[in-house]
Amino acid sequence: MQRKLIEIERRYDELTQLLSDPEVIGNQSEWQKYAKAQAGMTDIVEAFREYSEVVKHLEETQGLLEEKLDPEFKEMAELELEELTEKRDELEEKMRILLLPKDPNDDKNVIMEIRAGAGGEEAALFAGDLYRMYTKYAEHQGWRTELLSASYTDIGGFKEIIFLIEGQGAYSKLKFESGVHRVQRVPTTESGGRIHTSTTTVAVLPEAEEVDVAINPNDLRIDIFCSSGPGGQSVNTTQSAVRITHVPTGTVVSCQDEKSQLKNKEKALRVLRARLLERAQEEAMGELASERRSQVGTGDRSERIRTYNFPQGRVTDHRIGLTLHRLDSILLGELDEVINALITTDQAERLKSEA
């Protein structure tokens, strides 16, 4: 590990010099490329430099303890040695995590798709609860959200809702949300007070850039129709809604939320591009993914990942056995404790497989 860290630090210093070179400064695309590469190394280089300082002080303290010291000074040195040893171990663990292969999608924006599953109207209402939970979480993170497409039900739920989350590290934090979310509660339409169980499916896709997925316009069939609102009522007399079919894969995306046909087409293409990227990555990783199923789950949309129990105010993530009795705050977007636990478990599993 030491040799690898020294090499990373050397390259980091090279990039620092390049970024101050007048020729590089004059070439913006080249400067941005180097700046991005250096930014990706900053955390590991800072940790390594701090680690080197700690090791140096540790050796000095160990040397002191080999000398004859008065009892009070010796006690202070022993205490410092203990603290430095603990700090060294923490930094070693941190560096091991930072050296893990990075998911190339981690810095991408996210397209989230939430679909009502079993449970009819109650599942559709819960889809709305999850949509609000994720938009609130995004707000807490300082990210931007944009509605891309929605299919409403008569009582204000969603059969399906698709939205974009833009922000630094959005995919790295939200990727473990893919799967089946189960809700247990008494529906507002239930007169007998019985608890019903409903499900909603969440898919988290990294937003694909045009360079990630090349779409041949000849492979697309584009249909235009009138958009409709809850209950099938027409909300727009002009034909602004767009349905795009990618003929080779049979992937279909519809968008009708904008009054402009052009904007609906742009949004539909963003979703289509993300789905095609996911499809390509799944095909490429299929064999590897089946061999390396981490404790945090498969990311499969059919996997039941979490239960939200309203009568008990409880949220349980089944992949890591985490139960929290603060459902209200979680639905208000306070997801950090859940998401950080999932990330930590994933890192631990990957460290184990790298060992």
Curated annotation (Swiss-Prot):
- SMART domains noted in UniProt: PCRF
Specify the superkingdom: Bacteria
Q: How is it modified after translation?
A: Methylated by PrmC. Methylation increases the termination efficiency of RF1.
Sequence positions bearing N5-methylglutamine: 233
Q: Which GO terms describe its cellular component?
A: cytoplasm
Q: Does the keyword Cell membrane apply?
A: no
Q: Which UniProt keywords apply?
A: Cytoplasm, Methylation, Protein biosynthesis
Which Pfam families does the entry mention?
A: PCRF, RF-1
Q: Does the keyword Protein biosynthesis apply?
A: yes
Principal location listed in the UniProt entry: cytoplasm
Disulfide links within the chain: none
Q: Which GO terms describe its molecular function?
A: translation release factor activity, codon specific
Annotated membrane-spanning segments are none
Q: Where in the cell is it found?
A: Cytoplasm
Task: Spell out the family assignment given in the record's similarity comment.
Answer: Belongs to the prokaryotic/mitochondrial release factor family.
Role this protein plays: Peptide chain release factor 1 directs the termination of translation in response to the peptide chain termination codons UAG and UAA.
Name of the protein in question: Peptide chain release factor 1
Organism field = Desulfitobacterium hafniense (strain DSM 10664 / DCB-2)
